[in-house]
């Protein structure tokens, strides 16, 4: 079995794979102040609930967009699993031809998603990740990562609206069936929801136009289902795309990461 860990700005997603099959997965809040012991106890609690033990794990791979938490994460892996994890970053074999100005600037989550999407669904393809930021990545018909777009995520935008507009309340993010709200709350929810549906469709349409291609569009991320259910621009919803990519990258780099 291998342990895959995706460290995002808001949440960390943890998964256990055996023979390319996702057996278990969990989510915990990303807290850059957590110690390695706190992280270890949290993961061991997940394992206990699933009747797993640290000795079941032969390898670990981590993707992170939160550098301050990485020392604690790596220490946790060594202390509680006796494994030095593979870190997604410079030097890892991805199989991607990255054609951007500075490849080191690209978030590891975007690379992981691109690897998984290309392998699972073919190319050309657009990957939309609804996370803390909403990211759009384009991989061309030759499998080259050509770049993409980054926009504020739904939660960031919602919090900004509440924090910067004195008379507007904090609202839950929810699907809205009516674009014409009858109250302040319903109007905000309609604006947020349909605004992001429109953003998603607009950026995808412009990417297709500028790339002169007709790529498959796959969406992932915590809020992907809510948005994509209202949008015809997305072809595939894959909530485990990032975990799939981590498992695939582990296999591609396995000889240097085995226990």
Swiss-Prot record:
> Per the entry, which co-factors are needed?
NH4(+); K(+)
Its EC number(s): 2.7.1.33
Q: Where is the active site?
A: 109 (proton acceptor)
Q: Which reaction does it catalyse?
A: (R)-pantothenate + ATP = (R)-4'-phosphopantothenate + ADP + H(+)
- One Pfam family here: Pan_kinase
Q: Which residues bind substrate?
A: 107-110, 184
Protein residues bound to ATP: 6-13, 132
Q: Which GO terms describe its cellular component?
A: cytoplasm
Question: In which domain of life is the source organism classified?
Answer: Bacteria
Q: Does the keyword Nucleotide-binding apply?
A: yes
Localization (cell): Cytoplasm
- Its top-level enzyme class, in one word, is transferase
Q: In which pathway does it act?
A: Cofactor biosynthesis; coenzyme A biosynthesis; CoA from (R)-pantothenate: step 1/5
Q: Where does K(+) bind?
A: 129
A molecular function GO annotation: pantothenate kinase activity
Which GO biological process categories is it annotated with?
coenzyme A biosynthetic process
What keywords tag this UniProt record? ATP-binding, Coenzyme A biosynthesis, Cytoplasm, Kinase, Metal-binding, Nucleotide-binding, Potassium, Transferase
Tell me the subunit arrangement. Homodimer.
Name the protein family: Belongs to the type III pantothenate kinase family.
Protein name per the record = Type III pantothenate kinase
Name of the gene encoding the protein in the UniProt record: coaX
């Amino acid at each position: 079995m291998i342990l895959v860990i995706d460290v995002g700005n808001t949440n960390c997603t943890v998964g256990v794979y055996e023979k390319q099959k996702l057996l278990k997965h969990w989510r915990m809040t990303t807290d850059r102040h957590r110690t390695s012991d706190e992280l270890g106890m949290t993961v061991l609690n997940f394992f206990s609930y699933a009747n797993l033990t640290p000795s079941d794990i032969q390898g670990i791979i981590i993707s992170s967009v939160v550098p301050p938490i990485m020392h604690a994460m790596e220490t946790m892996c060594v202390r509680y699993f006796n494994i030095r994890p593979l870190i997604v970053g410079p030097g890892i074999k991805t199989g991607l031809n990255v054609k951007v100005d500075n490849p080191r600037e690209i978030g590891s989550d975007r690379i992981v998603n691109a690897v998984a999407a290309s392998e699972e669904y073919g190319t050309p393809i657009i990957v939309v990740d609804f996370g803390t930021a909403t990211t759009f990545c384009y991989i061309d018909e030759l499998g080259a990562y050509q770049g993409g777009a980054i926009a504020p995520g739904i939660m960031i935008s919602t919090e900004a609206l509440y924090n910067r507009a004195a008379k507007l309340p904090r609202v839950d993010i929810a699907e809205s069936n009516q674009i014409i709200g009858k109250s302040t709350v319903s109007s905000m929810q309609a604006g947020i929801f349909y605004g992001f549906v429109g953003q998603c469709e607009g950026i995808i349409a412009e990417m297709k136009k500028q790339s002169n291609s007709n790529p498959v569009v796959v969406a992932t991320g915590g809020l992907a289902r809510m948005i994509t259910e209202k949008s015809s621009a997305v072809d595939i919803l894959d909530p485990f795309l990032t975990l799939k990519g981590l498992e695939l990258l582990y296999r591609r780099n396995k000889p240097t990461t085995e226990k």
